[in-house]
Amino acid sequence: MKHVFPTYKRFPIDLVNGTGTVVTDKNGKTYLDFTSGIAVCNLGHCPTNVAEAVQQQLGNIWHTSNLYECALQDSVAELIADGKERLVFFCNSGTESNEAALKLARKYTGKEKIITFEKSFHGRTFGSMSATGQAKIHQGFGELVPGFTYVPYNDIEAFRAEIDENTAAVMLEVIQAEGGVIPANAAFLLEVQLLCKKMGALLIIDEVQTGLGRTGTLYGFEQIGLDPDIFTLAKGLGNGLPIGAMVGKSDLISAFGPGSHGSTFGGNKLALAAAKEILLTMKQTGFLEEVNAKADYFRNLLEANLEVLDNVSDIRGGGFLIGIELENAAEPVITELRDKGLLILTAGTNVLRILPPLTVSYAEIDQAIYLLKSVLENQLIGSEEG
């Protein structure tokens, strides 16, 4: 790729076709995709109903800008609101969703201090990068946006010591996906919510990777009983088409009037056509129940087959967002699995991150378990011989 900035460490395969969980490279080799395009293709690759919805919209109109009313935006926003008094700002990505959330929080509260957490990841544009609690993401870019502070995740005493009446917002993930697939303790999150209310700070939950069925409910925070002031979506909202959404309680409306924020392509009709069909699918009776049944099946097999291995130190996560912490580096495991036809990711140097489509079959889960076990056993033998 001679004409593209090398901002990504790319795997040496070029994927040209995908259906469901199966993708094919330009040489005709097939793989089970347990990355879902980094938690994007929650309904699998090229789902027929989503493709048909986009195709229909392609024949009508593609783009009008946000200078005009758009019934499709309102329809999708209503589906996202899920029966609650919520308003939506549409954009194109997760980092844009988080930027919008940060702007809204500061404008509504009139305060600047924002608390996030160590090992968090919220994006790579300046505001969301400043919110990200990882020094390696900050390196080389000079002074960050002022006003951000980071505290240890799951440490309520450290958080209690940091939050005060000058805090505009607290931004967090219910599972730190990029940071190592680290779930939050429910009691910790509930106490964070209470302290936010006490101090007049807004609670922002980044659901870019955990939302839209990935962890077993439409939004990950629902499992804990949280009621965030703002939450953010992207990734699975478009199943591969670029769309993001910042979702806020309706009483925040006074801070986001005309001119306060904008996006040329945000809420474009092609992406919205996909999002509407995706949300309708996820809200079908039995859909999430089936996702949870398969996720439980997968987790049980992972624990039964991998916990006994000496090079596996932990299996954690929720739903179809799973982390496997290894005693050794994850990269050799990723490479051998790819060679054998299974695509997964890392989350740090020694954590495997597994993100199958929510539509994965039981047979595909069985095949992935077989490959994971055999490769980890091979790696263990190799390390012992070395």
Curated annotation (Swiss-Prot):
Pathway this chain belongs to: Amino-acid biosynthesis; L-arginine biosynthesis; N(2)-acetyl-L-ornithine from L-glutamate: step 4/4
Keywords recorded for this protein, A-Z: Amino-acid biosynthesis, Aminotransferase, Arginine biosynthesis, Cytoplasm, Pyridoxal phosphate, Transferase
Domain of life, source organism: Bacteria
GO biological process, any: L-arginine biosynthetic process
Cellular component terms per the entry's GO annotation: cytoplasm
Family matches, as InterPro entries: AcOrn/SuccOrn_fam, Aminotrans_3, Aminotrans_3_PPA_site, Class-III_PLP-dep_AT, PyrdxlP-dep_Trfase, PyrdxlP-dep_Trfase_major, PyrdxlP-dep_Trfase_small
Catalysis: reaction(s): N(2)-acetyl-L-ornithine + 2-oxoglutarate = N-acetyl-L-glutamate 5-semialdehyde + L-glutamate
Keyword Cytoplasm annotated: yes
Enzyme Commission no: 2.6.1.11
Similarity comment text for this entry: Belongs to the class-III pyridoxal-phosphate-dependent aminotransferase family. ArgD subfamily.
Protein name as it appears in the record: Acetylornithine aminotransferase
Organism (species): Listeria monocytogenes serovar 1/2a (strain ATCC BAA-679 / EGD-e)
